[in-house]
């Protein structure tokens, strides 16, 4: 029931009560003798109850001293229904009486069920219902009092009092209440023919139970007591009333409980608001908090919110779910074995390392390996991010560190994992820009003390992950705190095969997962575990978008293009001249790489725009080379410059499309000259650049810098000359490939073989492209067979020679 409907019902009930009261008073003064029947409906019982209370107000007021006069309220069915749990059921029964028939039997069965269930009294449910009833009952009481306040007492002016009440002699006595209001009590049996104005109605009939000689009918404001007495005395003198018959005046101090209650309403509201704010602060009014963790109460800001996993938790990750980092997994498993079987190591006098730092590029599986440790260890695992220690308030970081290790010691043996520890573990005072004493340093100092300081206890193993070990404080990396640094690199081709097998098990493929895992592993060199998971998910999305029932190799190739090059934009507006320029540019890359010995084998070339700036690209399948020779880097430079050379030779104009190629060439050539020591003029010197690019001064002189710049220009010019000569030799083939690109937009290696023929260079070992076509396990078996045959042939030859 809404408050608006309740207020409207009360207003209608008040009007009907006045009409009913007029009918009870017997038609005096033009009051209507009857009132229309009360409307029945959803609020019928409430309106009838309020009407009965207001209509009999006079009877209750006169008999307030008699407790029995309230019995009619307690005996009222509507009154009892307000405070009964069965009100809704009875009300529902009334509303359903209109629809007889099948509903009768259901009502009887429901009433039996409800009566049987009502016998079981639930204290907590009753308390909850009582709390829910407080606010509606309080509001209902205020509305009831406001409705009952509109009584028959009439406010008049002093002039009306003088002319219409005092002059005819109708005033019995006056009661001045609270020195502000004069209540006029009219005689019980006045002479009605002396009343001159019909606007004031005095009733001679009495209601049942009223025996007082006078009744309180009128009131007016007096302003002040002295002025009121003077006015009244002057009025009585003017009327020539005998002083012995002056109207008696009494003064009272009345406390109207409704007004007194209303005085405290603002205070109660303020207290209630403060209480609600307090509850909100404890439950929801928060400060900080990581994603998925919610916020922190302002009163518990020093406490740390830890993700705690135990052996009974669901959605565990095990070591079998981690692939591509076998060596790192083996080292982490030693911690788990020690926690499960500590006696085996203690008998040999060994101590478990206090901590291990997981180091590696982003997406290699550091956090996943920590989750697997939590699932396999069988001990409490507490996980937190390094940024969760930092807050806007001073001293919160150290407090949270203490709270974290205190909780870990309470449930020892346990494992604590701090992800992205570089947020609090940066070197203190590095470079003179960090300030003397900040919140991060205080947090780091507290972490150092908790890991290895006075008062530390055994049983807590600390794991941490970071991709920036070079910026960590040396005190944090020393033995006794992080005894081990476990490096997790990007997986090789076999590691990628294992990772693909894990993710492909969850997909619906048209062939076996091993078929795809081998070929996709060869197709994705340099991909980390997170990139592989993204490729598998993108392939599933592309298959679903194309209404496919199974995922095929075409979907995986499109997913790899999406991850490498960005979103495909076939609707991008490109002019014919620009499209032709892009086609010749990409064909120049393809031809240059095809006829260079140390260049990477080409997978496909396309002129479909992708990403934000790429109008086309050539995709290669590089090998997982750990070392690069000078000749390999030179051929890669020539292949990168093939696009610019094709534009100059075939179109006669150069464009800005080679900007990215020139950037790669510049970076590659500077590395050869200044880092790898390939230049004879610079010598065997290496000047590696910092990754952050922040250097106040160069580690070499200006003369050396000039030599480096000159060498880089000469090397790039030499590579460009060779590339131009190569493009001129195969000018017709470049044009054919460009026309095919304009026609098909995408060319694979098979299409290039038809135009260019087989590559003139053969490698002794299979390339990643060969593994992509055939699968590397078959190649390994064939290679082992060839080696065994070669060994047998050599031994046979030696025997014959002997």
Swiss-Prot record:
Residues 1-23 have a biased composition (Low complexity). It is an enzyme of class 3 (hydrolase). It comes from the Eukaryota. Zn(2+) binds at residues 585, 589, 661. Its cofactor is Zn(2+). GO terms for biological process: mitochondrial protein processing. GO terms for molecular function: ATP binding; ATP hydrolysis activity; ATP-dependent peptidase activity; metalloendopeptidase activity; zinc ion binding. ATP binds at residues 360-367. InterPro entries: AAA+_ATPase (IPR003593), AAA_lid_3 (IPR041569), ATP-dep_Zn_Metalloprotease (IPR050928), ATPase_AAA_core (IPR003959), ATPase_AAA_CS (IPR003960), FtsH (IPR005936), P-loop_NTPase (IPR027417), Pept_M41_FtsH_extracell (IPR011546). Binds 1 zinc ion per subunit. One of its GO terms (cellular component) is m-AAA complex. Keywords: ATP-binding, Hydrolase, Membrane, Metal-binding, Metalloprotease, Mitochondrion, Mitochondrion inner membrane, Nucleotide-binding, Protease, Transit peptide, Transmembrane, Transmembrane helix, Zinc. Residues 85-113 have a biased composition (Basic and acidic residues). Its EC number is 3.4.24.-. It is found in: Mitochondrion inner membrane. The chain crosses the membrane at residues 133-153. Pfam families: AAA, AAA_lid_3, FtsH_ext, Peptidase_M41. The keyword Hydrolase applies. Residues 1-21 form a transit peptide. The keyword Magnesium does not apply. Its main location: mitochondrion. Probable ATP-dependent zinc metallopeptidase. In the N-terminal section; belongs to the AAA ATPase family. This is ATP-dependent zinc metalloprotease FTSH 3, mitochondrial.
């Amino acid at each position: 029931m809404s408050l608006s409907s309740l207020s409207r019902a009360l207003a209608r009930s008040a009007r009907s009560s006045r009409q009913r009261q007029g009918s009870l008073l017997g038609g005096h003064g033009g009051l209507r003798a009857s009132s229309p029947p009360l409307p029945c409906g959803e609020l019928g019982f409430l309106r009838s109850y309020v009407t009965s209370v207001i209509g009999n107000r006079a009877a209750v007021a006169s008999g307030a001293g008699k407790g029995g006069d309230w019995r009619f309220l307690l005996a009222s069915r509507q009154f009892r229904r307000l405070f009964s749990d069965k009100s809704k059921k009875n009300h529902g029964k009334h509303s359903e009486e209109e629809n007889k028939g099948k509903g009768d039997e259901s009502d009887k069965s429901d009433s039996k069920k409800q009566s049987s269930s009502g016998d079981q009294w639930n204290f907590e449910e009753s308390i909850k219902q009582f709390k829910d009833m407080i606010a509606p009952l309080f509001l209902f009481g205020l509305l009831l009092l406001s409705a009952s306040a509109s009584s028959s007492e009439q406010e008049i002016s002093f002039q009306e009092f003088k002319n219409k009440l005092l002059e005819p002699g109708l005033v019995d006595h006056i009661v001045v209440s609270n020195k502000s209001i004069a209540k006029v009590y009219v005689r019980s049996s006045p002479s009605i023919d002396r009343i001159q104005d019909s606007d004031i109605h005095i009733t001679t009939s009495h209601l049942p139970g009223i025996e007082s000689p006078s009744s309180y009918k009128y009131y007016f404001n007096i302003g002040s007591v002295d002025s009121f007495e003077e006015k009244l005395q002057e009025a009585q003198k003017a009327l020539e009333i005998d002083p012995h018959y002056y109207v008696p005046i009494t003064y009272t101090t009345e406390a109207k409980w409704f007004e007194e209650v209303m005085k405290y309403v603002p205070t109660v509201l303020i207290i209630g608001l403060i209480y609600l704010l307090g509850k909100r602060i404890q439950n929801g009014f928060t400060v900080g908090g990581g994603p998925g963790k919610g916020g922190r109460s302002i009163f518990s800001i020093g406490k740390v919110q830890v993700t705690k996993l135990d052996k009974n938790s669901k959605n565990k990750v095990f070591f079998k779910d981690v692939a591509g980092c076998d060596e790192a997994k083996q080292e982490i498993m030693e911690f788990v074995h020690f926690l499960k079987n500590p006696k085996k190591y203690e008998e040999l006098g060994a101590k478990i390392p206090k901590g291990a730092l997981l180091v590696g590029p982003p997406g290699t599986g550091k956090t996943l390996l920590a989750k697997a440790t939590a699932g396999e260890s069988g001990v409490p695992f507490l996980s937190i991010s390094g940024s969760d220690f930092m807050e806007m308030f001073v001293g919160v970081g150290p407090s949270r560190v203490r709270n974290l290790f205190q909780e870990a010691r309470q449930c020892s043996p346990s494992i604590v994992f701090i992800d992205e520890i570089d947020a609090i573990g940066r070197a203190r005072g590095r470079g003179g820009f960090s300030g003397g004493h900040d919140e991060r340093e205080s947090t780091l100092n507290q972490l150092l003390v908790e890991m290895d300081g006075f008062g530390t206890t055994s049983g807590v193993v600390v794991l941490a992950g970071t991709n920036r070990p070079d910026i960590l404080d040396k005190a944090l990396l020393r033995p006794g705190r992080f005894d081990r640094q476990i490096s997790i690199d990007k997986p090789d081709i076999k590691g990628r095969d294992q990772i693909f097998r894990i993710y492909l098990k969850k997909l619906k493929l048209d062939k076996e997962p091993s078929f795809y895992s081998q070929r996709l592993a060869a197709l994705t060199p340099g991909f980390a575990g997170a990139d592989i998971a993204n490729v598998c998910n993108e392939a599933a999305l592309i298959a679903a978008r194309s209404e496919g029932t199974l995922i095929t190799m075409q979907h995986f190739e499109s997913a790899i293009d999406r991850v490498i090059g960005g979103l495909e934009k076939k609707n991008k507006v490109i002019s014919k001249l620009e499209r032709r320029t892009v086609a010749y540019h990409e064909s120049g890359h393809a031809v240059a790489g095809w006829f260079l010995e140390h260049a990477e084998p080409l997978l496909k070339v396309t002129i479909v725009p992708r990403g934000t700036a790429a109008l086309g690209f050539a995709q290669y399948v590089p090998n997982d080379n750990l070392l690069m020779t000078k000749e390999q880097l030179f051929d890669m430079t020539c292949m990168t410059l093939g696009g610019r050379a094709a534009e100059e030779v075939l179109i006669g104009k150069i464009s800005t499309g080679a900007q990215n190629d020139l950037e790669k060439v510049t970076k590659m050539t500077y590395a050869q000259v200044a880092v790898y020591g390939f230049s004879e003029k610079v010598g065997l010197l290496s000047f590696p650049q910092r990754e952050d690019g922040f250097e106040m001064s160069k580690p070499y002189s200006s003369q050396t810098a000039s030599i480096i710049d000159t060498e880089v220009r000469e090397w790039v010019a030499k590579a460009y000359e060779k590339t131009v000569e190569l493009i001129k030799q195969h000018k017709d083939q470049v044009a054919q490939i460009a026309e095919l690109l304009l026609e098909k937009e995408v060319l694979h290696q098979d299409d290039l073989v038809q135009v260019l023929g087989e590559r003139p260079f053969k490698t002794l070992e299979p390339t990643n492209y060969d593994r992509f076509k055939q699968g590397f396990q078959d190649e390994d078996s064939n290679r082992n067979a060839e080696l065994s045959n070669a060994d047998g042939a050599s031994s046979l030859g030696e025997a014959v020679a002997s």
